[in-house]
């Protein structure tokens, strides 16, 4: 493939709260272990929208212009001299977190916890919502012909579901509660079923999102209104016939985490995926006296190979998650759509010559 000419790298850049712009960035120079990618499909994540609206997520503050995007797939156009496993023309999915050093967390395989990690579209690191993007070749995964670019981009949220189910030790025959029917809740549902969960119930405020959960495999759905966490937990137990061994909380809402504690079977596990306020009130004694283990999830690690295999074997289907598509030139409109909650997953197509999935 011919190298891109200078000035062709259209990128979506956040400058601060409420300020995103399409700008031309330089084509990045490769290091010896890097690849240059022609981006194809990039999904909009809630964190992208949050950086646009607020200019920060917790301690991560946008202090200089930053390219957004971290759910991505593209085509290799150039490789660094040390790269042996990829070549120009290869289609790849991008794992956005790359350790900058081999620290204690990397040595035990939990590189997602390394404090100095590079992570796409987390200040100060640029993301990949652009025409051309440089990434570490070791964190680019070749896609089989049977897996589309959009499926490759969806490996990022799918990885959150895989990692959450691993942290919860979801296994054959388990009953599972998923709190939240957004993109992360939906992929968690898909993974839990693929890992052998016998019954999965999904709860959410939105009837339309619960309908999507039912469409893709939820055994039961419960629409939450003004019930107390105790009452919701009783409904969960009623539809399942017993309390779930594993609850995976994907909203971050205080009441939802409380529901997770009340709903989970004694000796079971509550996995907290959703990021809410730093301080929340929890019925901790209720968890302690019933030995409900509470585990956190921060991004993911060691999930891309499994995700590629699951998609290639058609073990699960993530295609229904994509509800809207926009060309890169209309990325601001795409973000408006995502902000309004009009779709489940909004996908941006970065290659002007290929708008296919």
From Swiss-Prot:
Major localization listed first in the record, in broad terms: mitochondrion
One Pfam family in the UniProt entry: ADH_zinc_N
Protein's UniProt keywords contain NAD: yes
Keywords attached to this entry: Acetylation, Cell projection, Cilium, Flagellum, Membrane, Metal-binding, Mitochondrion, NAD, Oxidoreductase, Phosphoprotein, Zinc
Molecular function terms from GO: D-sorbitol dehydrogenase (acceptor) activity; D-xylulose reductase activity; identical protein binding; L-iditol 2-dehydrogenase (NAD+) activity; NAD binding; zinc ion binding
Keyword Oxidoreductase: yes
Cofactor(s) annotated in UniProt: Zn(2+)
Tissue expr: Expressed in liver and testis.
Phosphoserine PTM sites in chain numbering: 169
Catalytic activity entry: keto-D-fructose + NADH + H(+) = D-sorbitol + NAD(+); xylitol + NAD(+) = D-xylulose + NADH + H(+); L-iditol + NAD(+) = keto-L-sorbose + NADH + H(+)
EC number in record: 1.1.1.-, 1.1.1.14, 1.1.1.9
Binding site for Zn(2+): 45, 70-71, 156
Cofactor comment: Binds 1 zinc ion per subunit.
Enzyme category, top tier: oxidoreductase
Family listed: Belongs to the zinc-containing alcohol dehydrogenase family.
Domain remark text: Consists of two distinct domains, a catalytic domain and a coenzyme-binding domain.
Oligomeric form and interacting partners: Homotetramer; dimer of dimers.
Name of the featured protein: Sorbitol dehydrogenase
């Amino acid at each position: 493939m011919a190298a891109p000419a200078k000035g062709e790298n259209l990128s979506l850049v956040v400058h601060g709260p409420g300020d995103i712009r399409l700008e031309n960035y330089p084509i990045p120079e490769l290091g010896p272990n890097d690849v240059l990618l022609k981006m194809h499909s990039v999904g909009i994540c809630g964190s992208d929208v949050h950086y646009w609206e607020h200019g920060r997520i917790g301690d991560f503050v946008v202090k200089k212009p930053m390219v957004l995007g971290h759910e991505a797939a593209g085509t290799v156009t150039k490789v660094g001299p040390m790269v042996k496993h990829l070549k120009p023309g290869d289609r790849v999915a991008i794992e956005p977190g790359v350790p900058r050093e081999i620290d204690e967390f990397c040595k035990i395989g939990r590189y997602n916890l390394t404090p100095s990690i590079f992570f796409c579209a987390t200040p100060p690191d640029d993301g990949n919502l652009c025409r051309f993007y440089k990434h570490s070749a070791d964190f680019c995964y070749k896609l089989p012909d049977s897996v589309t670019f959009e499926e490759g981009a969806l490996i990022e949220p799918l990885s959150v579901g895989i990692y959450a189910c691993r942290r919860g030790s979801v296994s054959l025959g388990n009953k599972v509660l998923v709190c939240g029917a957004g993109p992360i809740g939906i992929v968690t549902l898909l993974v839990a079923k693929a890992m052998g969960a016998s019954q999965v119930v999904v709860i959410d405020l939105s009837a339309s999102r619960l309908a999507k959960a039912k469409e893709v495999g939820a055994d039961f759905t419960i629409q939450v209104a003004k019930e107390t966490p105790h009452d919701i937990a009783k409904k969960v137990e009623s539809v399942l016939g017993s309390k779930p061994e594993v609850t995976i909380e994907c909203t971050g809402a205080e009441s939802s985490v409380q529901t997770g504690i009340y709903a989970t079977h004694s000796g079971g596990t509550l996995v907290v995926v959703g990021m809410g306020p730093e301080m929340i009130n929890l019925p901790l004694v209720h968890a302690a006296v019933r030995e409900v283990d509470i585990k956190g999830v921060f991004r993911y690690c060691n999930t891309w190979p499994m995700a590629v295999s699951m998609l290639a074997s058609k073990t699960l289907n993530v295609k229904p998650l994509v509800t809207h598509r926009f060309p890169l030139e209309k990325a601001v409109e795409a973000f408006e759509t995502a902000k309004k909650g009009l779709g489940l997953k909004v996908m941006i197509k970065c290659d002007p010559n290929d708008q296919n999935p």
